[in-house]
């Protein structure tokens, strides 16, 4: 989602930087960090934080005078100066504007601290100071004493805590509580999570008091399940229950927005369409609002007056939004919606949108290894499953720039798509000959190598996509109006506009984190006149039924913004067409209390000190167990035990989630499943215990699968070193390669070599699905070489005729060194903190922005600067061409467009009865050409 507010800059540092400083004098904060702005930038410790209720409230409390309009004006003025001639006057003016822009965006009133060690947490609660200085002048930019504010559900899992300026933290905490009844009892971790909703990135939209709050619709039905109980012993007890009473909250996290008011929100968000769902926030309010014509339903049933949860009667014709109690988390802390709304106005809450369903739905997406590791396919079928991905890589290797564009931008582009980006894919749209350029070709080659590596670890392209989930909305209407609950969808049925239009009859539904084949379900895609009448406009939602186990199968999916991956890939349908049952985990509860700040901090401590592994560790262990399972015949004692262990990982994964909610987890992951030492037989063991340990010793999953060498570089190095050493030994002793010996050992000595190779091998090379895919991709590309074409004269296409001062070529050395250092620091930080893809993207954007600011301080004219950097990287072959695109991407595209009449050409799909210009992956395309307007404006591309 595009943010309508600019990203603010906050300090984010590890706790060790703060607490290792000497203690200060009495009366001052105990811990203090003195650091320069340049240090923060170079170490990626000045990070972006998107607009949220907290940011907007602090602006108001502090009185910062922040103005988004002024930010836009400054960016435009900077754009004008970077487009004007170089002069000292312009240079000084540019630096002044950059400083004003930085001062507006810099936000020292909140900071994020990564707790390096558990013992640091309590020290940080005592308070600390961060002083930020100007590197050149030594001037103090900010000096802030911080106190504890909160942690979010996502941040605490990474041991990250937010602290706020001590002068404003109490008022901010008061506003966050929004006048709630403080005597109400809650589970501390849950209330902490509800309060943390104020940190969600969001765009405010039109507010309304015309809101109806209704109770959730909960149904139950009998079904067959596998029940796991982890409360009594380390290894969860599994029970087959044939008539399990399955409960389902059909409105868990979703409500309605009138179609008229949805159009107002679409306009607020500057959209040219009305989304099928808005993921919203308000005070203690979270979930998806679906544009649904509940007023037309009222006309059909002839009922217009509905009682809300407080007993107040509302005319549905006067209602803009319908909330459910699962959305308004603290509904019982208010006496009416009017009281809630009054507090929201007092504390400046309003409805805001964090995300919305897209206008164009992806035609293709890639799988991950969790989605495909449990496939039951023959080797031939498995190869056919990955073949389109292999062929795609080979096509991109060629010199047809059209194939490259289809790969880079996907197959979902339309005539209306805004295709202009500041990267080489847009350059190819403007001039296809640039596919021969050495700099661009090197980026394509790097992309191909990465794509091969990704394919080895299960990133396989299929027809399918992620879409937001919703349960049969008519059921909520029937519930609200007191009608019989029937819904429009039956068991195993879904409605989805995308799949209906594609003619799909059935799809596979999956959702991460996925552990076992029990987490998959094949569902039927249906429609009829009644479904089209009520749901036909909801493009971007997967509407599921309210009478089966799909939510339970897909890792406890709910309706507050969760999405599911669906695909009609024939091999995934075939590979998952098997008999399986949903796995249900028995869960403990936590007593409710009247919560204080101490309770929230105790929840933090519980997470930081928790011995329960995170979900990622658990799912990786399940993958390792799945790999070991491949060694044994299906149905054997070993296979059945390992199959149980994979299913038990669903319980262990749930334990990790429950730990974050403050639930006490009595047992950790069974060590005997992953450690041979736990299976060591002792002399005093009973006969039964010796037999158990002997059996367990045969099926220990203590290694990562072979394909994980593409995920963990150090693992790959270890394996490569072992293979190199053993290959030399085999050639010397046996006159055969290591692979030849492994495949067919001829002597006892060779068999011993095979045995010890597998013992010392850091990875498990069992023939599991993912290892097979790894080997297939490796075999396919073992002699594969990327094109290495260098035609330096293509650099002239990227430049204009404008000259530049030759001093720039020398002055760029320092900027290039900063580029290398900052990217090295980014990679190091990512390896340590295991940041998400969105966090990595944000960090990379920060680097680009900071480097651009430094570049303009060297020379204010961006056209001349661009020409200089083109020469700098092309005259020095060892310099990264990515440096050029980071600094000058916008100007490069502008240069190319101005030379080609501002035209771009890109591939779009054609219908069966239309002529096509080329085929790619079995799909038919034509090149569509259009004129791009307004790109000379700084804001358009930037």
Predicted regions and their residues:
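Conserved small-residue
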Residues: 1-555, 572-574, 588-942
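Short hydrophobic-aromatic micro-motifs
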Residues: 508-510, 564-567
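Short active-site loop/helix that positions an aromatic residue
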Residues: 553, 566-581
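Active/binding-pocket-proximal capping segment
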Residues: 582-586
């Amino acid at each position: 989602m595009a943010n309508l507010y600019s990203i603010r800059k906050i300090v984010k540092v590890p706790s060790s930087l703060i607490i290792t400083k000497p203690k200060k004098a009495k009366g001052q904060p105990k811990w203090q960090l003195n650091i320069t702005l340049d240090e923060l930038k170079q170490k990626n410790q000045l990070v972006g934080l998107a607009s949220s209720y907290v940011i907007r409230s602090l602006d108001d409390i502090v009185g910062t005078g922040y103005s988004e309009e002024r930010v836009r004006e400054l960016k435009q003025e900077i754009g004008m100066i970077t487009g004007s001639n170089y002069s000292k006057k312009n240079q000084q003016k540019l630096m002044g504007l950059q400083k004003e822009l930085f001062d507006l965006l810099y936000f020292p009133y909140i900071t994020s601290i990564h707790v390096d060690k558990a013992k640091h947490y309590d020290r940080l609660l005592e308070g600390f100071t961060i002083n930020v200085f100007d590197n050149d002048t030594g001037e103090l930019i900010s000096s802030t004493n911080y106190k504890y504010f909160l942690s979010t559900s996502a941040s605490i899992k990474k041991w990250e805590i937010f602290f706020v300026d001590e002068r404003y933290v109490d008022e901010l905490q008061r506003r966050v509580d929004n006048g709630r009844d403080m005597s109400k009892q809650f589970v501390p971790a849950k209330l902490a999570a509800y309060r943390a909703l104020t940190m969600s990135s969001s765009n405010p939209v039109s507010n309304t008091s015309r809101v109806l709050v209704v109770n959730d619709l909960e149904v139950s039905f009998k079904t067959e399940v596998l029940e796991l109980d982890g409360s009594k012993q380390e290894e969860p007890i599994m029970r087959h229950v044939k008539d399990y009473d399955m409960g389902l909250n059909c409105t868990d996290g979703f409500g309605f927005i009138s179609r008229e008011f949805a159009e107002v929100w679409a306009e607020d968000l500057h959209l040219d369409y009305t989304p099928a769902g808005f993921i919203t926030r308000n005070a203690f309010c979270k979930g998806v609002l679906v544009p649904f014509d509940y007023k037309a339903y009222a006309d059909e049933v002839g009922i217009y007056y509905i009682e809300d949860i407080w007993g107040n009667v509302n005319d549905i014709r006067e209602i803009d939004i319908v909330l459910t109690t699962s959305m308004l988390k603290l509904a019982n802390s208010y006496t009416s919606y009017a009281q809630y709304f009054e507090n929201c106005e007092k504390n400046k809450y309003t409805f805001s949108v964090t995300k919305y369903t897209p206008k164009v739905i992806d035609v293709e997406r890639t799988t991950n290894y969790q989605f495909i590791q449990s496939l039951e396919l023959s080797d031939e079928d498995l190869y056919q499953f990955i073949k389109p991905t292999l062929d795609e890589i080979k096509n991109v290797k060629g010199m047809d720039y059209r194939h490259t564009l289809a790969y880079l931008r996907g197959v979902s582009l339309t005539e209306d798509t805004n295709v202009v980006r500041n990267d080489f894919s847009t350059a190819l749209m403007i001039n296809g000959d640039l596919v021969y350029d050495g700099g661009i070709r090197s980026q394509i080659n790097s992309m191909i190598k990465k794509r091969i590596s990704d394919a080895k670890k299960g990133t396989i392209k299929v027809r399918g996509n992620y879409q937001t989930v919703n349960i049969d909305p008519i059921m909520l209407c029937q519930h609200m109006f007191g009608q019989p609950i029937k819904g429009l969808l039956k068991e195993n049925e879904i409605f989805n506009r995308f799949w209906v239009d594609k003619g799909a009859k059935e799809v596979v539904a999956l959702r991460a984190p996925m552990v076992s084949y029990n987490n998959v379900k094949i569902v039927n895609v249906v429609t009829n006149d009644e479904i089209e009448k009520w749901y036909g406009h909801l493009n971007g939602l997967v509407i599921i039924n309210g009478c089966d186990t799909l939510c339970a199968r897909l890792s406890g999916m709910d309706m507050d913004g969760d999405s599911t991956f669906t695909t009609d890939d024939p091999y995934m349908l075939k590979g998952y067409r098997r008999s399986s049952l949903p796995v249900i985990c028995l869960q403990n509860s936590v007593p409710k209390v009247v919560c204080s700040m101490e309770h929230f901090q105790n929840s933090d401590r519980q997470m930081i000190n928790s011995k329960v592994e995170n979900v990622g560790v658990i799912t990786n262990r399940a993958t390792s167990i799945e790999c070991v399972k491949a060694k044994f015949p299906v149905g054997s004692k070993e296979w059945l035990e390992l199959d149980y262990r994979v299913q038990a990982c669903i319980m262990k994964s749930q334990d990790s989630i429950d730990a974050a909610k403050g639930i006490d987890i009595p047992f950790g992951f069974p060590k005997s499943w992953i450690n041979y030492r736990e299976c060591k037989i002792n002399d005093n063991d009973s006969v039964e215990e010796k037999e158990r340990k002997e059996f367990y010793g045969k099926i220990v999953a203590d290694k990562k699968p072979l394909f994980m060498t593409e995920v963990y570089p150090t693992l790959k190095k270890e394996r490569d070193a072992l293979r190199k050493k053993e290959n030399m030994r085999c050639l010397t002793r046996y006159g055969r390669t290591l692979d030849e010996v492994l495949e067919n050992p001829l002597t006892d000595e060779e068999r011993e070599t095979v045995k010890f190779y597998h013992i010392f091998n850091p990875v498990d090379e069992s023939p599991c699905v993912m290892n097979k895919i790894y080997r297939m991709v490796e075999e396919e590309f073992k002699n594969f070489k990327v094109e290495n074409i260098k035609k330096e004269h293509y650099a002239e296409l990227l430049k204009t005729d404008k000259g530049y001062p030759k001093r720039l070529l020398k002055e760029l050395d320092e900027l290039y060194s900063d580029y290398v250092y900052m990217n090295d620091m980014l990679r190091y930080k990512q390896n340590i903190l295991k940041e998400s893809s969105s966090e990595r993207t944000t960090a990379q954007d920060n680097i680009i922005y900071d480097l651009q600011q430094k570049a303009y301080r060297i020379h204010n004219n961006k056209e001349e600067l661009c020409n200089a950097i083109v020469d700098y990287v092309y005259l020095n072959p060892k310099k990264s061409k990515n440096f050029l695109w980071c600094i000058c991407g916008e100007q490069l595209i502008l240069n190319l467009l101005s030379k080609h009449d501002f035209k771009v050409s890109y591939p779009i799909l054609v219908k069966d009865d239309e002529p096509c210009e080329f085929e790619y992956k079995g799909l038919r395309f034509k090149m569509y050409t259009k004129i791009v307007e307004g790109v000379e404006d700084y804001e358009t591309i930037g």
